[in-house]
Amino acid sequence: MSKPIVMERGVKYRDADKMALIPVKNVVTERDALLRKPEWMKIKLPADSTRIQGIKAAMRKNGLHSVCEEASCPNLAECFNHGTATFMILGAICTRRCPFCDVAHGRPVAPDAEEPQKLAQTIADMALRYVVITSVDRDDLRDGGAQHFADCITAIRAKSPEIKIETLVPDFRGRMDRALDILNATPPDVFNHNLENVPRIYRQVRPGADYNWSLKLLERFKEAHPEIPTKSGLMVGLGETNAEIIEVMRDLRRHGVTMLTLGQYLQPSRHHLPVQRYVSPEEFDEMKAEALAMGFTHAACGPFVRSSYHADLQAKGMEVK
């Protein structure tokens, strides 16, 4: 029997070390090894990376993190080249260990009390008009990190009064009442929390999370702020069916969610959950049509769509795919 991994505080555990801690193991089959990316999944990189390096330098200078880098997002080059990024607060170490996600797992250090001001100054320096703020899960904090979100929102608005802020929050497991009390006092312009996938395979995809808890979080925020858009997203290609995706969309509408994102799951490494199928652009178009018919005000559905991909355009109801 192998010895359990003893996690050191502040150390990032990734790939094999991270997956070794997950009770649901990833067994690679011959079929998984043969599954190749179709042509529509090919990305063309920009010829000039000057702006990309500039954003990375600004992040490093202020000790900030982007989910674009930490989660190995396939859209990083495009978004950075257009001068946009999704900021990840509360460090780069997550207390969860979801096998689809490339963010490091471990025992995080205490939150940086100066981060809200650093973040606000960086955003002001970049002259951003729309910003997405997300975080790792912080099950070690009594409020799950909600006060840190609120502090960041307050600091950003103080330096950039005209900015629109979208928060992509964790589930605040076991701390929903406390977290919502804090967030309701300093609400964002868009409230986002991702379901990620369908109930049947939730234990495999999001160990430690609960499908109905996440729906309740979205519903309760919407009840407190009916004027603020609520948003959620799923990754597809993990073994779910299109019919199951449609049913999740219905659940989201029943809980008051008004914006939807659907995108193709891509395996970050061989240690992560394998891609079970590639959903075609035509299927994404069909699911978008279903979403709009259900009453979503906007649905961004496409192979490269991610929750914060062109989030400013999504918020305006413009076409994103």
From Swiss-Prot:
Binds 2 [4Fe-4S] clusters per subunit. One cluster is coordinated with 3 cysteines and an exchangeable S-adenosyl-L-methionine. [4Fe-4S] cluster 1 binds at C68, C73, C79, S308. Pathway: Protein modification; protein lipoylation via endogenous pathway; protein N(6)-(lipoyl)lysine from octanoyl-[acyl-carrier-protein]: step 2/2. [4Fe-4S] cluster 2 binds at C94, C98, C101. It is found in: Cytoplasm. GO terms for molecular function: 4 iron, 4 sulfur cluster binding; lipoate synthase activity; metal ion binding. This is Lipoyl synthase. It comes from Salmonella typhimurium (strain LT2 / SGSC1412 / ATCC 700720). Belongs to the radical SAM superfamily. Lipoyl synthase family. The keyword Iron-sulfur applies. GO terms for cellular component: cytoplasm. SUPFAM superfamilies: Radical SAM enzymes. It catalyses: [[Fe-S] cluster scaffold protein carrying a second [4Fe-4S](2+) cluster] + N(6)-octanoyl-L-lysyl-[protein] + 2 oxidized [2Fe-2S]-[ferredoxin] + 2 S-adenosyl-L-methionine + 4 H(+) = [[Fe-S] cluster scaffold protein] + N(6)-[(R)-dihydrolipoyl]-L-lysyl-[protein] + 4 Fe(3+) + 2 hydrogen sulfide + 2 5'-deoxyadenosine + 2 L-methionine + 2 reduced [2Fe-2S]-[ferredoxin]. The lineage of its organism: Bacteria, Pseudomonadati, Pseudomonadota, Gammaproteobacteria, Enterobacterales. Its cofactor is [4Fe-4S] cluster.
